[in-house]
Amino acid sequence: MKCLLIATGERVPTWVAQGFAEYHRRLSYWLPLELVEIEPSMRGKNHDPQRAIEDEGRRVMAALPKQPYAVTLDVKGKPLNSEQLAQRMEHWRGLGRNLVFLIGGPEGHSQEVLNISNERWSLGPLTLPHMLVRLIVVEQLYRAATILTNHPYHRGK
């Protein structure tokens, strides 16, 4: 199974890149994950945000592998606690398909991207910087892996 994290945005802050690299390294023993960065569209007072969303959506669609199982990070998605995410990870691994996590830009995902999503995952009702979301996602995937392998990292229930 190939696992991708397709994230809109480039040039993340150093501390985000360092945190992502650390959890990516830890996760790689259990679930090899490839980060694919999508160039964000121009934004500003003279740019149409809907057009930016559509442009980014086309770039995301072009980056998808064939027949992926797409999990879209979306505020309207299903919130999961760590144990529930671990259960979903076990399910996703058993599908035998390429697993793709999709992180949109500041305004979210295009309708085209939402339409191909097999699942929508919400990190909760908070508004988070989309650059920070990639770090949170990789840490949560690592946490899910430690739950499944009974590693002491997760100190939940």
UniProtKB/Swiss-Prot annotation:
UniProt GO MF annotations: rRNA (pseudouridine-N3-)-methyltransferase activity
Highest taxon of source: Bacteria
One Gene Ontology CC term in the entry: cytoplasm
Keyword Heme: no
Alphabetized UniProt keyword annotations: Cytoplasm, Methyltransferase, rRNA processing, S-adenosyl-L-methionine, Transferase
EC number: 2.1.1.177
Binding sites annotated in the UniProt record for S-adenosyl-L-methionine: L73, G104, L123, G124, P125, L126, T127, L128
Location in the cell: Cytoplasm
InterPro entries hit by this protein: Alpha/beta_knot_MTases (IPR029028), RlmH-like (IPR003742), tRNA_m1G_MTases_N (IPR029026)
Gene3D superfamilies hit by this protein: 3.40.1280.10
Catalytic activity: pseudouridine(1915) in 23S rRNA + S-adenosyl-L-methionine = N(3)-methylpseudouridine(1915) in 23S rRNA + S-adenosyl-L-homocysteine + H(+)
Cleaved signal peptide residues: none
Family designation: Belongs to the RNA methyltransferase RlmH family.
Main function: Specifically methylates the pseudouridine at position 1915 (m3Psi1915) in 23S rRNA.
Quaternary structure annotation from Swiss-Prot or TrEMBL: Homodimer.
Protein name in the entry: Ribosomal RNA large subunit methyltransferase H
Gene giving rise to this polypeptide: rlmH
